[in-house]
Amino acid sequence: MSENQDTQKSFLETVKFDDRGLVPAIVQDHETGKVLMMAWMNLESLKMTLEKKKACYWSRSRNKLWLKGESSGNMQDVHDIMIDCDGDTLLLKVSQKGGACHVGYHSCFYRKTTDGEQMEICDTLMFDPEEVYGKKS
Amino acid sequence: MSENQDTQKSFLETVKFDDRGLVPAIVQDHETGKVLMMAWMNLESLKMTLEKKKACYWSRSRNKLWLKGESSGNMQDVHDIMIDCDGDTLLLKVSQKGGACHVGYHSCFYRKTTDGEQMEICDTLMFDPEEVYGKKS
């Protein structure tokens, strides 16, 4: 077993950030196991998540730290953080307040396909994005 | 709701591959909800997955198509494929034969930290990698 696959190194030393300094974080409801979203973290947002126990990401579109729920109020309380064998993907077990998805659904994975062509909605709408984020001008 | 967030376009048209032509795929046990791994797909591996209903990825380390389980026998039968709001992450619901992780665990996420420093093993060893893949020379 290589050094990156065991538990000898510290957690932060084990995380492998990519060439942009980011690592993907899968977010899962800690009680139901439902996968809610995937987002990206840099070292700063990971440290903030560990410190505050609230999920904090790096927004690639806005190029800034993103405390999940800072606009919508839909914060994520972090219960556990897991890391994969290669150290290059994280899994957060959270309690999600409201919906995780900016479109208004509970999960960002609100569409599924079985035939590879058609898609259908497979999740519950939790809020109206225009009410939460304001109307787009 | 933008075009990329609804169900009007076809599934394959909705998938947004990154600048390497890849999209991350989260893999979840379809019965227990346990997150097993994350891997990457290109268009070819996604089409093969849809066609065969067996998970097929793009191996970034070997730079080739990777039918999951082709070496270990630990195939993944694909029940559903979901796509997130931005179209840039997939979620596969699968039946996993044996362990998903090449280290021998059921899930690649076999280590967790709660304090951000120490890590502990939180999963079950399913097989001995040396027996399955052969000894490393």
Curated annotation (Swiss-Prot), chains A, B:
UniProt protein name: Phosphoribosyl-AMP cyclohydrolase
Top-rank taxon: Bacteria
Pathway(s): Amino-acid biosynthesis; L-histidine biosynthesis; L-histidine from 5-phospho-alpha-D-ribose 1-diphosphate: step 3/9
Cofactor info, note text: Binds 1 Mg(2+) ion per subunit.
Subunit and partners: Homodimer.
Family: Belongs to the PRA-CH family.
EC numbers for this chain: 3.5.4.19
Pfam family name, one: PRA-CH
Cofactor: Mg(2+); Zn(2+)
UniProt: Mg(2+) binding residues: 84, 86, 88
Gene name of this polypeptide: hisI
Source organism (scientific name): Chlorobaculum parvum (strain DSM 263 / NCIMB 8327)
Gene3D superfamilies from the UniProt entry: Phosphoribosyl-AMP cyclohydrolase
GO MF annotation list: magnesium ion binding; phosphoribosyl-AMP cyclohydrolase activity; zinc ion binding
PANTHER family xrefs: HISTIDINE BIOSYNTHESIS BIFUNCTIONAL PROTEIN (PTHR42945), HISTIDINE BIOSYNTHESIS BIFUNCTIONAL PROTEIN HIS7 (PTHR42945:SF1)
Catalyzed reaction equations: 1-(5-phospho-beta-D-ribosyl)-5'-AMP + H2O = 1-(5-phospho-beta-D-ribosyl)-5-[(5-phospho-beta-D-ribosylamino)methylideneamino]imidazole-4-carboxamide
The protein's role, per its UniProt record: Catalyzes the hydrolysis of the adenine ring of phosphoribosyl-AMP.
Keyword Nucleus in record: no
Subcellular location field: Cytoplasm
Recorded GO CC terms: cytoplasm
Keywords, sorted A to Z: Amino-acid biosynthesis, Cytoplasm, Histidine biosynthesis, Hydrolase, Magnesium, Metal-binding, Zinc
Residue sites binding Zn(2+) per the record: 85, 101, 108
Broad class of the protein's primary localization: cytoplasm
GO terms, biological process: L-histidine biosynthetic process
